[in-house]
């Protein structure tokens, strides 16, 4: 698809560029509040790009040297690079042939052979949400953490097996 940028968007950017507060002005706080509301989150913190966001998330969760992290090979390079930037090693997990997202059955196989894998970074490719119920269950059963790469799925939602509507990032 195409991006949706209208005249009001262009005016808002020009107004900000012409203001005295370019990088930490009131528009940042306004955008963070709107983004949090849109995603159903309590807070949102904007960064320069998705790579920086993933890198920060990896650092915050403790990725460091020798940390192994499962992720999809079908993604923008930032997903795996964020692990590398933090000192860890990405371990690529095959995808589901129907959704093109990381495959829970393949995650199970890799974790069984590599019990030292610390976490999973599923990518919601093209807005199609990965099987987060299965991925979360596998992570919980194995003492692993999950960071969702939701760059393609901001505000996305899915319904779990009990009929409960979930938001990306729950």
How would you label these PLM feature ranges?
Residues 1-21, 26:
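N-terminal "arm"/small-domain region of PLP-dependent enzymes with the aminotransferase-like
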Residues 21-68, 82-85, 92-94:
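Phosphate-binding glycine-rich loop
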Residues 5, 23, 75, 98-99, ...:
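Glycine-/small-residue-rich active-site loops that bind phosphorylated ligands and cofactors
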């Amino acid at each position: 698809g195409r991006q949706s940028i209208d005249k009001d968007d262009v005016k808002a950017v020009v107004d900000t560029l012409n203001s005295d507060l370019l990088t930490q002005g009131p528009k940042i706080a306004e955008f963070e509040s709107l983004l949090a509301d849109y995603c159903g989150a309590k807070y949102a913190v904007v960064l320069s790009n998705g790579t920086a966001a993933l890198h920060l998330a990896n650092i915050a969760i403790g990725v460091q040297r020798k940390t192994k992290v499962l992720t999809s090979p079908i993604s923008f390079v930032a997903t795996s690079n964020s692990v590398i930037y933090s000192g860890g090693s990405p371990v690529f997990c095959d995808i589901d042939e129907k959704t093109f997202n990381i495959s829970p059955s393949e995650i199970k196989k890799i974790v069984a052979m590599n019990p030292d894998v610390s976490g999973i970074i599923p990518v919601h490719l093209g807005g199609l949400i990965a099987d987060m119920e299965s991925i979360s269950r596998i992570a919980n059963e194995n003492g692993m953490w999950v960071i969702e790469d939701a760059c393609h799925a901001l505000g996305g939602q899915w319904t779990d097996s009990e009929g409960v509507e979930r938001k990306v990032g729950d």
